[in-house]
Amino acid sequence: MEILGTKYELIKNDHGLIEANIDGECKTYAKVIRIRPLQDMLYGEATEDERKKRYSEVMRHEVIHAFFNESGLSDYSNNEELVDWLAMQFPKMLKVFQELGCTE
C-alpha cells in the first residue's frame, strides 16, 4: 500500500504480535504495518463481529500513524490518544462527508 507516496508493507495475521501482547504496530523506519490475527483480537467472550470491529479499528489506527509520520507530524503520531480518537471516529466522519458529497 502507499501512504502519501511511500510504499508500506502490510502484514496481516502476524502471530508475533500475540507474544508482544499488542494488536498492531507501525514500524516507521521499516515502512511496515503489522496486525495480529483476527481470531486473536480481544479476549474472552468477544463475538466475531466485535473482533472484526476491533481488527478494522486497529488497521485504521496503524495507518493513521503512518500518515502522520509521512506528513512530518511525528509528534502527532506519538500521541496515542489522538491516533485512537481518529481511528474510532473516522467511519462516522466519512459517513458525514459522503452525505455532504465532499470526499473529493
Which residues make up each language-model segment?
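Active-site scaffold of zinc-dependent metalloenzymes
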Residues: 1-53, 66-70, 74-89
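Long, well-structured alpha-helical subdomains associated
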Residues: 98-104
